[in-house]
A protein has these predicted regions:
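A Rossmann-like FAD-binding core segment of flavoenzymes
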Residues: 25-27, 69, 75-96, 103, ...
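Beta1-alpha1 glycine-rich phosphate/pyrophosphate-binding loop at the start
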Residues: 1-79, 117, 166-189, 328, ...
Length: 510
């Protein structure tokens, strides 16, 4: 069997290695248009910031190591420019010489990835404007920063890579402004959870311009102007365009393969395209949302690696299947961590799901052990079935651990109240005897058994309009003074028993 793989990095490289482990006799050829066949693109911002000092650490495999370890032929700086399905061949262009040749295949795996979105606007040709997707992009940005020593940078977009780059530039002493068309950063989070991230960036000196659209760029002597709708242009020494990515599916489209959401390549659960001899994996493919069943894009390294493995398995006769993505994600925001899995409220509403949400802010470990800090957990579950729909956590230490527990619970089909019964590891430096995940389960259980009723901030307008309703804030005096909602009276919880007479027994209390 001869297998040609178009693209390396996560999906293609994983497929190649898995194929070799399953079939020693297969002929495996990888064509990669960049100069690096397998690299840690999630680590690119940290190389720019100097956190990762040795760029070789970002290179996971080289053509030489692929050949020596796996007997796989890898050709970098080679781009597949056409697929000829009728004769099962691809046209390959050597990007260094311009020469073209054909390579036949028995099976073809497409892993072209995604491209940074570059909308039609003026100034995209400026040498002071960058995107970040490849090692070459990284080297270009780092070289610019080291040589030009920019004092200001404007970053358009509020996604993972862009925010990680913003943090690293800020840590290098660059004054950073983030321009985001939406009213929040990090769309996997709901706005209430993203507000913690906004506050952290602002506390670190990063300027946020939300609900602001970039309309173009203009290079001037020694600077680049970022033009925004309804405002004065922003002057900086460099700008980064990070407004998202789109699936690089042009090769598949020209070959007549079926496409799906946003032009992504349509695949089945075995990662087969509409041509049974062609598979596709990674950021270019359409995947099923494991919670809602809807089809869309998930541009994350974890799913891409798993898809590469599944495609290789199926090629070799194994019944592996990809059952959808929970899109579990995590990001470092200076000393803070934000993470999400499953769907958020916006997606739940779009899917027409009837859901309940709970929000809690426990400490990451035992309160008496030094260094404890609060994390905020937001959990969504379906009202009727009680299945967990999604979760978001923002905090400091221990956020990543808790989001992984919740992602596992979702995939295992656990119901929200069952989180109360999870037997999780405990020692004072790491957790509490009642772990934050258990506490989320306790709250869900109390709600569903009728022991507790809850209301949310968005319910306040309605509650205030009702006659005879008392609004009670049981936080400490200091917490109340630091900020409270209008219309609430403050009776600290520890004083409540002694002050019950201040409440009207004939009025509902919220």
């Amino acid at each position: 069997m001869k297998v040609v793989i178009v693209g390396g990095v996560a999906g293609g490289a994983s497929a190649a290695a898995r194929l070799r482990r399953l079939d020693e006799s297969a002929q495996i050829i990888v064509f990669e248009r960049s100069g690096y066949v397998s690299y840690a693109n999630c680590g690119l911002p940290y190389y720019i910031g100097g956190i990762i000092e040795n760029r070789d650490l970002l290179t996971l495999q080289t053509p030489k190591s692929f050949k020596s370890r796996f007997n796989i032929d890898v050709h970098v700086h080679h781009e597949v420019v056409a697929i000829h399905r009728d004769r099962k061949a691809v046209t390959v262009r050597n990007l260094e010489t311009g020469a073209e040749f054909e390579e036949t295949y028995d099976k073809l795996i497409l892993s072209p990835g995604a491209r940074p979105i570059r909308p039609p606007m003026p100034g995209l040709e400026s040498k002071r404007l960058f995107t970040l997707r490849t090692v070459e992009d990284t080297l270009q940005i780092r070289d610019f920063v080291e040589k030009e020593k920019p004092r200001h940078a404007v970053l358009a977009g509020g996604g993972f890579i862009g925010l990680e780059l913003a943090e690293n530039l800020c840590e290098m002493g660059v004054e950073v402004t983030i321009v985001q068309m939406l009213d929040q950063l990090l769309t996997p989070l709901d706005k209430d959870m993203a507000s913690f991230v906004h506050a952290r960036f602002r506390a670190k000196g990063v300027h946020l311009m939300l609900k602001t659209a970039v309309s173009g760029f203009e290079e001037r002597e020694g600077c680049i102007l970022t033009h925004v709708d309804g405002g004065e242009p922003l002057c900086s020494e460099m700008a980064i365009l990070a407004i998202g990515v789109s699936p690089d599916s042009s090769l598949a489209r020209e070959a007549g393969l079926a496409l799906g959401a946003r032009g992504a390549i349509s695949v089945d659960e075995h990662m087969r395209t509409s041509d049974p001899d062609i598979y596709a994996v990674g950021d270019a493919v359409q995947v099923r949302n494991a919670v809602t069943g809807s089809l869309g894009l998930v541009s994350l390294a974890g799913p891409a690696n798993k898809q590469g493995r599944i495609a290789a398995d199926h090629l070799c006769g194994l019944d592996s299947a990809y059952h959808g993505a929970y899109a579990s994600s995590v990001i470092k925001v200076f000393d803070m961590t934000a993470a999400a899995t499953g769907i958020n409220e916006h997606a739940a509403k779009e899917a027409g799901l009837s859901y309940e949400k709970i929000v809690l802010s426990p400490e990451n470990h035992a309160s008496y052990y030094p260094g404890g800090r609060a994390m905020t957990i937001k959990l969504l579950y379906e009202k009727e079935s009680l299945r967990i729909l999604g979760a978001q956590i923002v905090g400091f230490d221990g956020v990543d651990k808790r989001i992984d527990v919740l992602a596992t619970a979702m995939q295992a089909g656990m119901k929200a109240p069952e989180l109360a019964c999870l037997d999780l590891a405990y020692a004072p430096p790491y957790s509490s005897a009642k772990d934050p995940i258990n506490m989320a389960g306790f709250i869900a259980e109390n709600i569903e058994t009728g022991k507790v009723k809850q209301f949310h901030y968005e319910d306040l307008a309605d509650l205030r309009s009702r006659p005879g309703v008392m609004l009670l804030d049981t936080r400490t005096v200091g917490e109340y003074a630091a900020g409270h909602a209008e219309g609430f009276i403050n009776i600290p919880l520890d004083s409540l028993r002694d002050r019950l007479a201040e409440l009207d027994a004939h009025q509902p209390v919220y």
